[in-house]
Amino acid sequence: MSIQYQWLTKERNMILNINNIHTAEIDALPIDETWTMGEVKPSLMHSIHAYPAKFPPFITTKALQYAKQQGIDVHTVADIFCGCGTVAYEALANRKSFFGCDLNPVATLIARTKCRKYDSNEIKKYFKRIKKMFFSDSVDMDEYFCKNTRICYWFYPNQVYDLYKLRSSIISVVELDKYLDFFFCAFSSILKSCSKWLTKSIKPQIDPRKQTKDVWEEFCRQICKMERANESSEVVEENNAKILTQSVLDLNINEPFVDLLVTSPPYVTSYEYADIHQLSTLWLDYSPDYKHFRTGSIGSLYHSDDLRFNVPKLNQSGLSVVMQMYSIDKKQAKAIAQYYVNMQAVVKKICNVVRKGGACLFVIGNTEYKSVKIDNARHLAESLLNEGFYNVTIKRRKILNKILTPYRDKNGKFSSDKTSRKIYSEEFLIFAQI
């Protein structure tokens, strides 16, 4: 390696420690292009269901390579905010065991579906049976579906009836849980296109002029798409994957078992995942009220404790942000404080999950609200240092091909207006060993 290349590599990284954590100019780090774009086209399995702010698939493989360079022998990979299972799939494709959790049942449904290999003949067999039942006699609708105010708000009556018939057909026909997940994932993925939900809008918004799609045609199209994805999947039928529908903060771990944790925590003042996935939550009967999943959701603007309880728990980086926000917006300051306290608790929990000699790779971005920089990356790095992690290295990557609007208006709301502040064009990778 040339001296020049050594210098460039060094400058793309920054080692953080307790002495420089508050002064390090992490925003001045040059973009590390090697962590910006993958060399291999992502698997079709990553497109079986829409999901906001998807984790870049190639980062998991690069994280495994990086850990190997650091002398870490990786057998088990974990993602404690597993979302739709991007890290899960990539870990299994690299023949590693996987452990993941997420509070959102829609997310874990998608993740479980990605982590399995399916028999094409079984898919076709079940599909034929579902079709036969769907086009057979009429059904008497469950009162929950025909009178649910949220379902009636989002769907026209004929769509409600057809979706109910399809759901009932899937439940009646599919016997194995593995294939039930597959068909429920397909069902979930067509709900927005069959509803009044504004096309291409991530957040809930009615389009009164939207031409809704035919339920059966959309389902057929989605099953074909998922069949093609399954045929190209690199996941083997027998694999070691465990995915739990619960918060990382509620995990009961007897002893550390993970060699490498790869995850992207939620951002405060960003998405309310419970709201975004409300159609699937309602139709799959995960809860009669989607707002239930706001409780315990890290990064949610709801259910924050009083500032008097949270402020004393904050590290210096977190306290600095909260105090700046407090003078501008007390409600947001309260939500940010809760998020930072939760993330500090997450780092403590990670110490019970990742074994000594193991490592973590976090992908996290900073946000901005009413001209206050929400320095998530620095807060996370300080949290890691305070819990005894070492070799805390930070890089900066450019965001590409992500379902994320990179602009906010003057009030901090998402906007497609390029004259607004661009705050999501880059994000940070934080590597830390324990």
Where are these regions (language model features)?
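Core SAM-dependent methyltransferase catalytic element
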Residues: C351, R355, N411-I434
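SAM-dependent methyltransferase catalytic-core segment centered on the flexible catalytic loop
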Residues: Y267-K349
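SAM-dependent nucleic-acid methyltransferase catalytic core
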Residues: V160-T263, V268-I276
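Conserved proline-anchored active-site loop of SAM-dependent methyltransferases
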Residues: T60, V77-N94, F98-P105, A111, ...
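S-adenosyl-L-methionine
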Residues: M1-Q70
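Short helix-loop-beta connector
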Residues: A67-T76, N94
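Conserved helix-to-beta-strand junction in the class I
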Residues: V346-K356, E387
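Conserved phosphoryl-transfer catalytic core
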Residues: V106-V173, L279-N310
